[in-house]
Regions:
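Consensus positions within tandem repeat domains that build extended binding/scaffold surfaces
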Residues: 17-19, 65-67, 87-90, 110-113, ...
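Structural signature of tandem-repeat unit edges
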Residues: 1-14, 24-40, 47-62, 71-85, ...
Length: 337
């Protein structure tokens, strides 16, 4: 029977639900601390009878998937600075949990973290957290206050689904903002030209998905991140005005949009896979047919599925978008100095 587990290093690992249940390690009382099972610096599971306020041990790096799921007797959890990942469903169905603070050391809060927390009212996410998914979901109607940090680079448009938060946000021409973030657009209202509010730093994943009545978008200089699928399948979106300052365009951000040309700013640092994938540029003269690459200025933006065995990237290219060389997998890629 498994009696000991040793993780070398403190890097976060994803521990799946009930990963050690029934093992010798799990059944050894010496491995439990105040109703919590730790594996190295990872919080793996909790006892079903754990109650009151839980103080997670200092030095903990991650909270495992479903670690506190259905622990109906806990009323609070103190998460120490140093925890880096909170995995999917970590606090799902904690029916007596009312408030919780996520420290700034956490890099990512995964999906459905607080789903089914029927008594939850307030969540504070401290500055430093970078990514927040759809952390609520069903039975979170009592959540009326969520404090978001200025540090977010990724958030999901479904972040507040299942809560009462959206009831307290007044949309601007069908677009919902919270703090510095554009969260969501009502596809039945937004139309024509959309001017994203100045001061916005990120557009949430899938925020404008299938908003087929919009024809053009103007982005502010404050914008830094366009998250995955933000304008996915906007069938009539033919023009986007970018401003200097934007740094990251995530995968499939404008997939399926008939945009014939992109004037991308010099501030761009990364472009995700298929960020602008559509049939709008199939016959464009900006294709380097010999090497199977499509360019917008000094950015290699797309690649043909079938490429030659040797691909030479154009001299002066500053950015190669994610995944564009992954089609037929050329044997040799030459990148000029």
């Amino acid at each position: 029977a498994l009696e000991d587990i040793i993780f070398l290093g403190d890097e976060p690992v994803e521990i799946w639900r009930r990963a050690f249940s029934g093992s010798g390690y799990y059944n050894n009382p010496k491995n439990w601390e105040n109703g919590v099972l730790y594996v190295g610096n990872h919080l793996a599971e909790t006892d079903e009878n754990i109650s009151g306020v839980v103080n997670i041990r200092p030095g903990t790096v991650s909270v495992a998937e479903s670690a506190f799921e259905s622990r109906h007797l806990i009323t609070g959890v103190n998460i120490p600075y140093g925890v880096r990942y909170i995995h999917q469903g970590a606090f799902r169905d904690c029916s007596q949990l009312k408030t919780i603070t996520v420290p700034g050391s956490v890099e990512s809060i995964s999906y459905h973290t607080f789903e089914g927390c029927t008594s939850l009212e307030k969540v504070v996410i401290e500055d430093g957290v970078k990514r927040v998914g759809e952390i609520f979901g069903r039975d979170c109607q009592n959540v009326t206050q969520v404090v978001l940090p200025d540090s977010l680079t990724y958030l999901d448009s479904a972040l507040f689904h299942g809560t009462s938060i959206l009831n307290n946000i007044k949309p601007v021409n069908g677009v919902y903002y919270i703090g510095k973030y554009l969260l969501y657009a009502d596809e039945e209202i937004v139309k024509g030209k959309v001017i994203v509010k100045n001061g916005t730093t990120a557009i949430a994943a899938h925020a404008f998905r299938e908003c087929n009545m919009i024809t053009s978008v103007e982005l502010p200089a404050s914008l830094r991140h366009i998250n995955q699928g933000a304008f996915d399948s906007c069938a009539n979106l033919a023009s986007v005005k970018f401003s200097e300052g934007i740094e990251v365009i995530d995968p499939e951000a404008f997939i399926g949009c008939p945009i014939p040309k992109f004037n991308l700013p010099k501030s761009i640092k990364r472009i995700g896979s298929r960020a602008f994938f559509s049939n709008a540029y199939e016959n464009s003269s900006r294709w380097d047919e010999k090497n199977g690459l499509y360019y917008e200025g000094n950015i290699a933006l797309a690649g043909e599925y079938y490429m030659p065995e040797t691909v030479t990237v154009k001299k002066g290219t500053k950015i190669i978008a994610d995944g564009i060389l992954g089609g037929s997998r050329p044997k040799r890629v030459i990148i000029p100095a």
